[in-house]
């Protein structure tokens, strides 16, 4: 899983590998690292059940964060590395935009702009000079070639979709970028079974003019490469 040729976004290099043992709560778990049990900070609040199971191989960085000694960076499956450090999502999206893989010609105006009842991830300026709000979501769940978001209910995510629709009504451009971090994904869909409220909010936002993007990225040791844009299917479905 070394880095191949092509444009690469370099990632922070983990210090250690280990074996995941159990999750304690949304942001902490226990792993066997260097022959002893250690606390690991998990930045991604999703359930990650398909990745963080007892015995899973993980990669982590040393850190000082309360009781946790390590910061979870990635999970290594049989033939796939999966990034689980959601603190990097904004950096990844900016890299995609600045390198022309997505929203070509747009420029970064501000990070974490305030709008309505909260903040979004990015404020961009379009080639025509319009303001564009951007919300970024990382996707680590893949089932049968379909990337699904979310893997846990997210009332905050649904609220963001409603606010983006309102932004369009007030003259902004608005975009949702799904960063698909699973190499077998061939399409992207909201996870209707897991969080119908979010899925319905995303569908309404799309109908209101919010633009939806899904970008697949391949992870290597230790970098990411753009793979492709994926088709997005917003239609309701049963699983």
Swiss-Prot record:
Molecular function GO terms recorded: DNA binding
Alphabetical list of Pfam families matching this protein: SfsA, SfsA_N
InterPro entries associated with the record: SfsA (IPR005224), SfsA_C (IPR040452), SfsA_N (IPR041465)
PANTHER family: SUGAR FERMENTATION STIMULATION PROTEIN A
Entry's family note: Belongs to the SfsA family.
NCBIfam families the UniProt entry points to: sfsA (TIGR00230)
Name of this protein: Sugar fermentation stimulation protein homolog
Protein source organism: Pyrobaculum aerophilum (strain ATCC 51768 / DSM 7523 / JCM 9630 / CIP 104966 / NBRC 100827 / IM2)
Lineage, opening ranks: Archaea, Thermoproteota, Thermoprotei, Thermoproteales, Thermoproteaceae
């Amino acid at each position: 899983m070394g880095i191949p040729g092509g444009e690469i976004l370099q990632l922070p290099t983990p210090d250690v590998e280990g074996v995941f043992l159990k999750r304690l709560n949304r942001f902490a778990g226990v792993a066997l690292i260097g022959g002893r049990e250690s606390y690991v900070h998990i930045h991604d609040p999703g359930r990650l059940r398909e990745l963080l199971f007892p015995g899973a191989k993980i990669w982590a960085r040393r850190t000082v964060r309360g009781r946790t000694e390590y910061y979870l960076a990635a999970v290594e499956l049989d033939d796939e590395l999966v990034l689980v450090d959601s603190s990097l999502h904004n950096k990844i999206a900016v890299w995609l935009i600045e390198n022309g893989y997505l929203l070509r010609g747009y420029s970064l105006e501000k990070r974490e702009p305030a709008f309505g009842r909260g903040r979004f991830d990015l404020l961009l300026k379009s080639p025509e000079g319009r303001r564009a709000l951007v919300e970024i979501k990382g996707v680590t769940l893949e089932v049968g070639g379909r990337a699904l978001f979310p893997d846990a209910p997210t009332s905050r995510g649904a609220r963001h979709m409603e606010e983006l629709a309102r932004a369009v009504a007030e003259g902004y451009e608005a975009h949702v970028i799904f960063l698909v971090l699973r190499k077998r994904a061939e399409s992207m869909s909201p996870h209707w079974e897991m969080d119908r409220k979010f899925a319905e909010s995303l569908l309404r936002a799309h109908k209101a003019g919010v633009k939806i993007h899904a970008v697949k990225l391949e992870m290597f040791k230790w970098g990411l490469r753009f793979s492709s844009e994926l088709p997005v299917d917003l239609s309701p479905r049963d699983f």
